């Protein structure tokens, strides 16, 4: 029910069909109940890929800075939820929280941009999608069952830093993302899993 389609592009088919940062989608699904976008970079906010998953009654959850782009694209304002970091929300009966996603030792994702990761609760399971981030004071406090974390380095945590974060927050399952397309390799994902505490199950879900 959970797929990493490419890079940081995730599809969850549970009580709702949810996409996070659809990117390089290779077919027309057009079945999204909710689309979550973490931030305004081409490999996370891709209008071409949104078109492949959106349907008539899809809700799109975005950071505030993306509102003008979506409205210009012709998306109905009533179908858009804008979010800020460190808040709790509800969309189509689904609870979610926003966790700040930013760099601490590089400049690609400034904290002041208000970009986010998401903690989404589905069937009483909390899924944390970290977004493009380093280890931060906020994400070190995240409580979740399943965590999707970037391991590719350069713009985000590398595999060692990602493992450090996961070993601290201790989800049941950890899934490496943000590699294999723009930056990072499958080896980064494999090395990440090797560094996890034995109590945490690391799973590679990347399709390509």
Regions inferred by a protein language model and the residue ranges of each:
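Redox-cofactor binding/interface segments in oxidoreductases and associated redox assembly factors
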Residues: 20-21, 36-37, 97-101, 149, ...
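Metallo-beta-lactamase
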Residues: 119-172, 176-184
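Binuclear metal-ion centers of metallo-dependent hydrolases, dominated by the metallo-beta-lactamase
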Residues: 3, 74-90, 140, 163, ...
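Core dinuclear metal-dependent hydrolase active-site scaffold
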Residues: 1-30, 81-143, 157, 206-208
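Divalent metal-coordination and catalytic microenvironments
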Residues: 12, 39, 46, 96, ...
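Active-site metal-binding motif and surrounding structural segment of the metallo-beta-lactamase
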Residues: 23-69, 81, 143-148, 170
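Portal/gating segments that form or line small-molecule/metal binding sites
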Residues: 50-104, 116-118, 190
